Amino acid sequence: MSPSAAVLIPLAAAVLLRPVVGQTQCGGNLYTPGTLNFTLECYNAFQDCVAQFEANASQVDCNDGKGNLFMQQQANLGASPGSQNNDAIIAFQDIRDLCLLSGSTTATWGYSDNQWYWAAAEDACYTNDPTRTDVVKTHPAPFCIQNRDSSLPECYPQPDATPPGGPLKVIKTAKTRNGFKSSARGWNTYGVQALVNGSQVVPSFAGQSGLFYTQKFVETQCGVLARPEFKKAGYDLCSLDSGWQATTAVDQHGRIIYNTTRFNLPELASWLHKRDLKLGVYITPGVPCLAHNQTILGTNIKIKDVLNGNNDQINCDFDFRKDGVQQWHDSVVAQWASWGVDMLKLDFLTPGSPSNGANLACDSSDAVRAYQKAIKKSGRKIRLDISWKLCRNETWLPIWSDLAESMRTDQDLDNYGTNTLMAWQVGQRAIENYRQYIGLQAQRNVPLTIYPDMDALFTVNPEHLAGVNDTIRYTVQNHWLGAGANLIIGGDMEQVDALGLKLTTSKQSIDAADFFAKYPMQPRNPGTGSNAAKQLQAWIGGPSDDHEAYVLIVNYGPDLGNGGFSTKLYGKQKVTVSLKDLGISGSAWTFTDIWSGKSSRVTGSYSAWLTEGESQLLRLKRTH
């Protein structure tokens, strides 16, 4: 057994107890991995110090006694004895594998529970003597170490600027990889899970928090989806976010199973299907680390023989070059299909998932491919949603478009640390990310085969829970409709008010959703028709072959930090967009506000006075 493997085995068990989301920072002198080796003397001293630190949270310093290796820990001595330095092992594994053995000579590791670790290796710990055998080989870092604040700019380029007055290229959507012709509609647990104390504001969540929610809560919420008004509007997906899985057990073949204390997924799926609803579940790449000794179904292969490290998110990563990996995915999806699962959300994918604070594989697209193949083999029609804020440059947008039904275009919309669902500042950011996404899709000049996932739709609850006023609730709904995005409600289905019902289940909402599923909207700036981010903005979806279109005009209000437009116009503003701006001049059109029902005939331009955060969604029909 190699020195590195000797530490990885107990680490797997440690990580299973809770997800460790530390941040490693490499520094010091740089070297090219493979050109130097790490001396076994320094390696053993490193391991000895780790053991000392683990045994004594009060110990601060440790070194090799020769001036070549120095290490420190700052434990959280105010915590309970078992939690003061419980990150020490995983922290020093990261310091060792991601930095000292991978191109850097110093490293720090920090985590939000007030634990901090550091190590530095001097030149004497490294050798370029090829004849020495008392060494540990250096290697490229097995993970992409992302700074918590990294925006991964190479992943999210701005779309090419469209020329003022340029022709309109209608964007169309074709069938997805698995044959779906619209984005998903339904409800998801996470909006309530993310509330700082959801049990205070969502009665059916009483006694629950975060990842610890129950099947009874899900049935209470999704029972509302079974009502005729939601069923008619197509809101049929009941989606479980993280928390349904067992974290301390797998089945005999190492497959992910449900937490039997709080769930019975086959029973839940049956309950939903009897009501014409569908079941969705949340997953992340990899396999639970405690499954390492299990044998993959239909093979003689142990899971531990096809792994490629630990990604700090409870799971261990697969080496997709090895036989057995696809068979594991096939067996997992086959079991979920037998339970009645209709949708998979695959989260923490890369390239993407920026600022995650974890050690993720640089490219986990093979996990998407493996699940896609497994879905096809299962014979069940299952949606695949991939997440989050995935790389959308010219390399990756075509790849994701060929693998899944929908892709997350931004980070979470949730208003963390509060008991409200969202804040308008984050809403502006989500809309700006969609603007970039659709502009990049338009440049490809091909029908879209994937839908945007803009995160949960927080429009059905009144302001005290939604976190935004009714004016902005309209605007959020208008944008999610216009994008052809997943319409997955977040929040409390038992507190849907009259406006929430109108926004999601009215005929005008259904008609708009069906239209935008085929013709997603794109920006056409008032006055120029360009696609830049503007506070006073216009969008158009279509026109269709039947000479129908939708136009959205909006005043986003002052840029709250992530709107992309930087201006700060306050109060009501006049928004005027011409048919030329929209790219549909030469004909007369009837503009009808879908929510108020007011209509006007337009031959030149259309104007409206809109306050901060206000918008109008207009249905257009050509009159000649």
Curated annotation (Swiss-Prot):
GO biological process, one term: carbohydrate metabolic process
Organism: Hypocrea jecorina
pH dependence: Optimum pH is 3.5-4.5.
SUPFAM superfamilies given in the database record: (Trans)glycosidases, Glycosyl hydrolase domain
Main function: Alpha-galactosidase involved in the degradation of simple oligosaccharides like melibiose, raffinose and stachyose, and of polymeric galacto(gluco)mannans.
Residues carrying covalently attached carbohydrate according to the record: N37, N56, N197, N259, N293, N393, N469
Location(s), subcellular: Secreted
E.C. code: 3.2.1.22
InterPro entries (UniProt xref): Aldolase_TIM (IPR013785), Glyco_hydro_27 (IPR002241), Glyco_hydro_b (IPR013780), Glycoside_hydrolase_SF (IPR017853), Melibiase_C (IPR041233)
PANTHER family: ALPHA-GALACTOSIDASE 2 (PTHR11452:SF33), ALPHA-GALACTOSIDASE/ALPHA-N-ACETYLGALACTOSAMINIDASE (PTHR11452)
UniProt keyword list: Glycoprotein, Glycosidase, Hydrolase, Secreted, Signal
The protein, known as: Alpha-galactosidase 3
Primary localisation category: secreted
The family this protein is said to belong to: Belongs to the glycosyl hydrolase 27 family.
Catalytic activity: Hydrolysis of terminal, non-reducing alpha-D-galactose residues in alpha-D-galactosides, including galactose oligosaccharides, galactomannans and galactolipids
Signal peptide (from-to): 1-22
Transmembrane feature ranges: none
Top-level taxonomic group: Eukaryota
Record-annotated active site: D347, D412
Lineage, opening ranks: Eukaryota, Fungi, Dikarya, Ascomycota, Pezizomycotina
